[in-house]
Regions:
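Short, Lys/Arg-enriched N-terminal segments with co-localized hydrophobic residues
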Residues: 1-11
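A glycine- and small-aliphatic-rich helix-loop capping segment at beta-alpha/alpha-beta transitions
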Residues: 36, 130, 177, 212-213
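Short, conserved loop/turn and helix-capping segments at secondary-structure boundaries
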Residues: 63, 67, 134-137, 172, ...
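Beta1-alpha1 glycine-rich phosphate/pyrophosphate-binding loop at the start
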Residues: 13-83, 163-207
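FAD-binding core/adjacent interface of flavoenzyme oxidoreductases
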Residues: 12, 81-173, 180-186
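A Rossmann-like FAD-binding core segment of flavoenzymes
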Residues: 40, 79-91, 99, 179-250
Length: 250
């Protein structure tokens, strides 16, 4: 009597994910979870740390430190069977299906590009030179230092978004964080606080609003004495003023 053993041949599919923030990490972990042993997943990112970007708005006020909102991504990826490559992706050859990095080349069957947005600081003259951006670790720390200097000689503050911005939620959060911080520093009465936004109305958020959003925000603006301008862009930023698309100078 003969015994036959059938060996299943596993054809490994390789997916390379470029970028290791929310989209990249989620894609890599989900593809591996669903593909199991038949799917090799490689995540390539130039940073070894995962940064919880939404919490950057707390950094300028010392309510969080960078170590509180970041962790090494390799450990969690390795635990789930995803290979992590700490490298910078330089180019993609779609003909040969190869991602070229500063640490070597990586062949793929499937490719996920999740490198995130690039902020356009050239959207208006002076934005790069005279404004602050809280959306990066370096920017958040520079803003912390700027606020410390601001306390010595307080004056008007303009917070908001430029034309073509698409996600306003964090900016509103930051606005109210600043207002609270000013009160905590006992300098609120010395500061005219402005909110400028390309939104059609307060609380649009880039998603066509939410129930009662406009009503609540109008109430908050009045309650906290925050001046606001909607449906405006930034024409220019100078050392001591913001020129709106309407011509108004703040």
């Amino acid at each position: 009597r003969s015994n036959f053993i059938l060996l299943k041949s596993i054809i490994m599919t390789t997916t390379v994910v470029v970028g290791g923030s929310f989209a990249g990490m989620t894609a890599a972990l989900e593809i591996k979870r669903k593909g199991k042993d038949e799917h090799k997943v490689i995540l390539i990112d130039k940073s070894p740390l995962f940064l919880f970007i939404p919490s950057l708005i707390w950094i300028p006020f010392k309510r969080r430190e960078m170590k509180d909102i970041s962790f090494k991504k390799e450990g969690i990826l390795k635990e789930k069977g995803v290979d992590f490559v700490h490298a910078e992706a330089l180019s993609v050859d779609t003909e040969t299906q190869i991602v070229k990095t500063d640490k070597g080349d990586f062949k793929y069957d499937n490719l996920v590009v999740a490198t995130g947005p690039k902020v356009n600081f050239d959207v208006a003259p002076g934005v790069a030179e005279f404004s602050h951006y809280v959306g990066t670790p370096n920017g958040a720390m520079k803003l912390r230092a700027a606020l410390e200097e601001f306390k010595k000689n307080p004056g008007p503050i303009v917070i908001g978004a430029t034309q073509n911005a698409g996600c306003m939620g964090a900016a509103y959060e930051f606005l109210f964080n600043v207002e609270k911080w000013l009160r905590e520093q006992n300098i609120r009465k010395k500061v005219d606080l402005y909110w400028v936004t390309p939104e059609d109305y307060l609380g649009h958020f880039g998603i066509d609003g939410m129930p009662m959003g406009e009503t609540m925000l109008k109430s908050f603006m009045k309650m906290f004495n925050i001046h606001y301008r909607t449906q405006v862009g930034i024409q220019e930023v100078t050392k001591d003023s913001v020129i709106l698309s309407t011509g108004e100078v703040l």
